[in-house]
């Protein structure tokens, strides 16, 4: 009887090709717009391990109904089953190499981590940076203060100190940035850090203020520009004294913001032309002459994609500037409006990587900044990553690691949502649906993976897809069913052009994200 029962189970799995495995428990809390997972010192859900063998696939699903990286094991079938969507992946056609995903060590993030018990903040770092968590590969580090700081500060407020003798890090660095960078490095020793200034010290600007509009005084090559270049080098040197080195450096966060007369936050105006001239005359040579800066990858733009490709053309067509540049930083706030700009930029400048340097949800003036359990923000996050990956981007970075219930702290009340929200009074944190949306990419797509060709048999406007080949030969397919127009569940059949005998059959629920991880040694 027992052998007959086991035979029936085997036949069921062979026919239907799915073996459901319960995910690690999420302590759910439901709100008007959706569900969060509550984490404390007693419990916190984790990503279920792959636990598959050659020829099997693991399917992870997150949905608006509450599934959070629920895992099913998919068994390949040698006959093509019925499906409403047929997807073919072809690893012989390769595109960009993926560098990884990341988040930002903002003052606000550090303040919130510090507000929690040490073991709980350590758990957050593990959830973000370990290979059992989101496996983040990048950390963005602000140079001095931002809108997500408790106050406005620079590293040298001594006017006319062109040699930067009075440069010094602040309490925010020693309390909120450096400790948590090191904590993250404990879980990912290969973490790539890139720094970005929101503003030059006020005395270097035309307005004499860090906040609001204004450019650097003078022009490239003068005392002001030379001093600002030294400011960058001194930052790298001082962090080096704490054992922290940097992979990359942005010339300026959102340089176009400095032209906005209504802008209230820290900013410094650069045009493409003035950024080009600053790089080739001042910053590039200063970094090249510095032991802490000579190997740093310099990023240009670090602003919305609508500035491309013209911005890249202006800087990178000048060989005296381009020789110092590693890549192009892009923000997410015009995504969906200007899809072809990334593709066009890559075609013109294929030797320079494109990196997503900032993205967030809930930043609009009329938005509910922190909206617990909001599924649409998870879908928007996934859609943004899918769009960027399919248009030559090599990585993607979240604006904050963790914020409070207001979406801060922020000295200028510039609140947003975040993947993790802190509740220090209860010694808890909430993992928003956005956290899981990021995990569908970052946990499975390994550094060095390449995007590969994929196609669907029909045009389905509500479904977005992408596919990757990992360095170990495993393949990753991410699908989003936004379901914002029509409530449609899809049955999906994935076929690998490299092995046409095997088909993977699964369900893509309405308003859901899935990741299919295929274990194979085939390249």
Swiss-Prot record:
Residues 1-23 form the signal peptide. One of its GO terms (biological process) is glucosylceramide catabolic process. One of its GO terms (molecular function) is glucosylceramidase activity. Pathway: Lipid metabolism; sphingolipid metabolism. The active site is at 358 (nucleophile). Keywords: Glycoprotein, Hydrolase, Lipid metabolism, Signal, Sphingolipid metabolism. InterPro entries: GH30_C (IPR033452), Glyco_hydro_30 (IPR001139), Glyco_hydro_30_TIM-barrel (IPR033453), Glycoside_hydrolase_SF (IPR017853). Glycans are attached at residue 168. Its EC number is 3.2.1.45. The keyword Electron transport does not apply. GO terms for cellular component: membrane. It catalyses: a beta-D-glucosylceramide + H2O = an N-acyl-sphingoid base + D-glucose; a beta-D-glucosyl-(1<->1')-N-acylsphing-4-enine + H2O = an N-acylsphing-4-enine + D-glucose; an N-acyl-1-beta-D-glucosyl-15-methylhexadecasphing-4-enine + H2O = an N-acyl-15-methylhexadecasphing-4-enine + D-glucose. PANTHER family: GLUCOSYLCERAMIDASE, GLUCOSYLCERAMIDASE 1-RELATED. Glucosylceramidase that catalyzes the hydrolysis of glucosylceramides into free ceramides and glucose. C.elegans contains specific sphingoid bases, which are unique or different in structure compared to the sphingoid bases found in other animals. Two examples of these distinctive compounds are: 15-methylhexadecasphinganine and 15-methylhexadecasphing-4-enine. Belongs to the glycosyl hydrolase 30 family. This is Putative glucosylceramidase 1. It comes from Caenorhabditis elegans. The gene is gba-1.
């Amino acid at each position: 009887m027992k052998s007959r029962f086991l035979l029936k189970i085997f036949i069921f799995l062979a026919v239907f090709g799915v073996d459901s495995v319960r995910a690690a428990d999420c302590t759910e809390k439901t709100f008007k717009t959706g569900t969060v997972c509550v984490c404390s010192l007693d419990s916190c859900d984790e990503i279920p391990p792959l636990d598959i063998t050659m020829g099997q696939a693991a399917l992870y699903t997150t949905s608006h109904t509450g599934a959070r990286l629920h895992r099913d094991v998919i068994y390949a079938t040698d006959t093509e089953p019925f499906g409403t969507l047929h997807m073919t992946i072809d690893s012989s056609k390769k595109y960009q190499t993926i560098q990884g995903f990341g988040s930002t060590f903002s003052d606000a993030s550090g303040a919130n981590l510090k507000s929690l018990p040490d073991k709980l903040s350590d758990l957050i770092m593990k959830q973000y940076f370990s290979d059992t968590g989101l496996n983040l590969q990048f950390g963005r580090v602000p140079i001095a203060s931002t809108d997500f700081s408790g106050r406005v500060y620079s590293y040298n407020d001594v006017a006319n100190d062109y040699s930067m003798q009075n440069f010094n890090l602040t309490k925010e660095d020693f309390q909120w940035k450096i400790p948590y960078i090191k904590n993250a490095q404990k879980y990912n020793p290969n973490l790539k850090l890139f720094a970005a200034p929101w503003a030059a010290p006020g005395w270097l600007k035309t307005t004499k203020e860090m906040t609001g509009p204004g450019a650097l005084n003078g022009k490239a090559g003068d005392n002001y520009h030379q001093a600002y270049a030294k400011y960058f080098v001194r930052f790298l040197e001082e962090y080096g004294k704490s054992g922290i080195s940097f992979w990359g450096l942005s010339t300026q966060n959102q340089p176009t913001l400095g032209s906005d007369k209504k802008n209230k936050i820290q900013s410094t105006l650069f045009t493409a032309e003035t950024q080009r001239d600053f790089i080739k005359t001042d910053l590039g040579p200063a970094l090249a002459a510095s032991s802490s800066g000579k190997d740093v990858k310099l990023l240009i733009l670090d602003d919305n994609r609508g500035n491309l490709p013209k911005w890249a053309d202006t800087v990178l067509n000048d060989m005296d500037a381009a020789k110092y540049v590693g890549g192009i930083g892009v923000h997410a706030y015009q995504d969906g409006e200007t899809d072809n700009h990334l593709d066009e930029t890559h075609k013109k400048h294929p030797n320079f990587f494109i990196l997503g340097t900032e993205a967030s949800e809930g930043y609009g003036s009329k938005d509910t900044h922190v909206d617990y359990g909001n599924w649409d923000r998870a879908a928007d996050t996934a859609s943004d990553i899918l769009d960027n990956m399919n248009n030559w981007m090599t990585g993607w970075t979240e604006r904050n690691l963790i914020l409070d219930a207001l979406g801060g702290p922020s000295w200028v009340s510039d609140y947003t949502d975040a993947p993790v929200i802190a509740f220090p009074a209860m010694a808890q944190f909430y993992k928003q649906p956005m956290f899981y949306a990021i995990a569908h990419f970052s946990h499975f797509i390994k550094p060095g993976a390449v995007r590969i060709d994929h196609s669907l048999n029909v045009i389905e406007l509500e479904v977005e897809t992408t596919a990757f080949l990992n360095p170990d030969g495993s393949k990753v397919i991410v699908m989003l069913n936004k379901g914002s127009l029509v409530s449609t569940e899809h049955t999906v059949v994935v076929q690998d052009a490299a092995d046409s005998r095997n088909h993977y059959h699964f369900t893509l629920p309405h308003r859901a994200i899935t990741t299919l991880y295929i274990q194979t040694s085939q390249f």
